[in-house]
Amino acid sequence: MYKVILHKNAAKYYRNADKKLQGRINTAIDIILENPRYHVHIKKLEGELKDMVRYRLGNLRILYEIHENVKTVRIKAIEARGSVYK
C-alpha cells in the first residue's frame, strides 16, 4: 500500500472543508492509496500536467503524483473542477 503526502495547499483545503466533505475526501484518498492508477474516477492527465493523475470527487478534483520507487502518493491539490487545472 502507498503512503500519502499532502501538499500545503491540499492540506489547507482539507482543513477548511466541513466534516462531511472531509469524510468524502478521506474515502477518496483510501481508494487512491489502494490502487493509485486504476479506478473509474481516476484519469492520467495530459499536456503540461502529464505527470499528474486526477481523482474526480463530484465537482472537486484531487490532483496527485505517484512515486513508485518509494510507494508514495503526493497530493498536490484538492480544488473545484474549474480552478484546479489553472
Predicted regions and their residues:
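A short, surface-exposed loop/turn module that caps and links secondary-structure elements
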Residues: 30-54
